[in-house]
């Protein structure tokens, strides 16, 4: 779960990370009151879970409370990369002398943790990593040890901090590691981490991603979820325990097993190049259970996406045999009735495949087309989606 900046700021503060004052506001009037309470120069910052706020006009400096009112009036309701701004954070202005970068994240490729640090912050870190990779220090973190004082010292030295700053920055890094470890995060990022004119090290912006698999250890994490900010289809799928991610294409995807679903996305995208450049509309893994209830729930979510023009069901029968999957599809279509109004291409293989195909053939549903292979199914689904565009 990604946190809003103001939530990350509050979490940092709770773990002793130095931050400046910040108050969330949902209306221009609340923004003005917050600016008056903080006093002096403030920054009005759009609260959306996406980057590029500054370039989109979602971050503005306010020298007075009236300016904070004006800026928040313009920012609230703004669309930033498809995300509507429903709240802003009024942040205390900072006297910035230098900007740095720090993050610690789960390194899935190497089954490890990774700390990244640079004395050049404030810019897109991806751009820095490409243009000047030597400016971004990367230090592997042993999960069994974490970031202790020795490792924090190693990180700041590798990043090239001046000797007189290393102790201060290392102290902040230790506290950020405390956030990462104790909150079960998969990402903690500060960009920029700044040195103020007074020489203090302060986290001026923050990004935190929490591991939802660890929610059972953190009752308070449920309170951080903003259902209004979630994609409605993803929220609907989550309520039904479906592993669903919405994408931007036209071909709905249902499969069993994350690996098979990801392969299906690739094959559909490739097939779409020959059919109007249609693309996958979602990732949906129904796992090992393909009952009528699960299939109906999955189809209900996918068919609720107005962008979807066809659906490709790609299942390899294992523990759940293909005949059970076929019965689930037939039952799902019957349960959904008129709301099932888009063509389905179904490819079955594996355990009891012949019986599964027989069940679908006998059902003879007008929306269902059987495919013998994944390539054939992807091509047909892309063709149908393109025809319906």
Swiss-Prot record:
<comment type="subunit">
    <text>Heterotetramer of two alpha and two beta subunits.</text>
</comment>
<dbReference type="InterPro" id="IPR013650">
    <property type="entry name" value="ATP-grasp_succ-CoA_synth-type"/>
</dbReference>
<dbReference type="GO" id="GO:0004776">
    <property type="term" value="F:succinate-CoA ligase (GDP-forming) activity"/>
</dbReference>
<dbReference type="GO" id="GO:0042709">
    <property type="term" value="C:succinate-CoA ligase complex"/>
</dbReference>
<comment type="pathway">
    <text>Carbohydrate metabolism; tricarboxylic acid cycle; succinate from succinyl-CoA (ligase route): step 1/1.</text>
</comment>
<feature type="binding site">
    <location>
        <position position="256"/>
    </location>
    <ligand>
        <name>substrate</name>
    </ligand>
</feature>
<dbReference type="GO" id="GO:0000287">
    <property type="term" value="F:magnesium ion binding"/>
</dbReference>
<dbReference type="GO" id="GO:0006099">
    <property type="term" value="P:tricarboxylic acid cycle"/>
</dbReference>
<keyword id="KW-0479">Metal-binding</keyword>
<comment type="similarity">
    <text>Belongs to the succinate/malate CoA ligase beta subunit family.</text>
</comment>
<dbReference type="InterPro" id="IPR016102">
    <property type="entry name" value="Succinyl-CoA_synth-like"/>
</dbReference>
<dbReference type="InterPro" id="IPR017866">
    <property type="entry name" value="Succ-CoA_synthase_bsu_CS"/>
</dbReference>
<keyword id="KW-0547">Nucleotide-binding</keyword>
<keyword id="KW-0460">Magnesium</keyword>
<dbReference type="InterPro" id="IPR005811">
    <property type="entry name" value="SUCC_ACL_C"/>
</dbReference>
<feature type="binding site">
    <location>
        <begin position="52"/>
        <end position="54"/>
    </location>
    <ligand>
        <name>ATP</name>
    </ligand>
</feature>
<keyword id="KW-0816">Tricarboxylic acid cycle</keyword>
<dbReference type="Pfam" id="PF08442">
    <property type="entry name" value="ATP-grasp_2"/>
</dbReference>
<dbReference type="InterPro" id="IPR005809">
    <property type="entry name" value="Succ_CoA_ligase-like_bsu"/>
</dbReference>
<keyword id="KW-0436">Ligase</keyword>
<dbReference type="GO" id="GO:0005524">
    <property type="term" value="F:ATP binding"/>
</dbReference>
<feature type="binding site">
    <location>
        <position position="45"/>
    </location>
    <ligand>
        <name>ATP</name>
    </ligand>
</feature>
<feature type="binding site">
    <location>
        <position position="205"/>
    </location>
    <ligand>
        <name>Mg(2+)</name>
    </ligand>
</feature>
<dbReference type="InterPro" id="IPR011761">
    <property type="entry name" value="ATP-grasp"/>
</dbReference>
<protein>
    <recommendedName>
        <fullName>Succinate--CoA ligase [ADP-forming] subunit beta</fullName>
        <ecNumber>6.2.1.5</ecNumber>
    </recommendedName>
</protein>
<feature type="binding site">
    <location>
        <position position="99"/>
    </location>
    <ligand>
        <name>ATP</name>
    </ligand>
</feature>
<feature type="binding site">
    <location>
        <position position="94"/>
    </location>
    <ligand>
        <name>ATP</name>
    </ligand>
</feature>
<feature type="binding site">
    <location>
        <begin position="318"/>
        <end position="320"/>
    </location>
    <ligand>
        <name>substrate</name>
    </ligand>
</feature>
<dbReference type="GO" id="GO:0004775">
    <property type="term" value="F:succinate-CoA ligase (ADP-forming) activity"/>
</dbReference>
<keyword id="KW-0067">ATP-binding</keyword>
<dbReference type="Pfam" id="PF00549">
    <property type="entry name" value="Ligase_CoA"/>
</dbReference>
<comment type="function">
    <text>Succinyl-CoA synthetase functions in the citric acid cycle (TCA), coupling the hydrolysis of succinyl-CoA to the synthesis of either ATP or GTP and thus represents the only step of substrate-level phosphorylation in the TCA. The beta subunit provides nucleotide specificity of the enzyme and binds the substrate succinate, while the binding sites for coenzyme A and phosphate are found in the alpha subunit.</text>
</comment>
<dbReference type="InterPro" id="IPR013815">
    <property type="entry name" value="ATP_grasp_subdomain_1"/>
</dbReference>
<dbReference type="GO" id="GO:0005829">
    <property type="term" value="C:cytosol"/>
</dbReference>
<feature type="binding site">
    <location>
        <position position="191"/>
    </location>
    <ligand>
        <name>Mg(2+)</name>
    </ligand>
</feature>
<dbReference type="GO" id="GO:0006104">
    <property type="term" value="P:succinyl-CoA metabolic process"/>
</dbReference>
<feature type="domain" description="ATP-grasp">
    <location>
        <begin position="9"/>
        <end position="236"/>
    </location>
</feature>
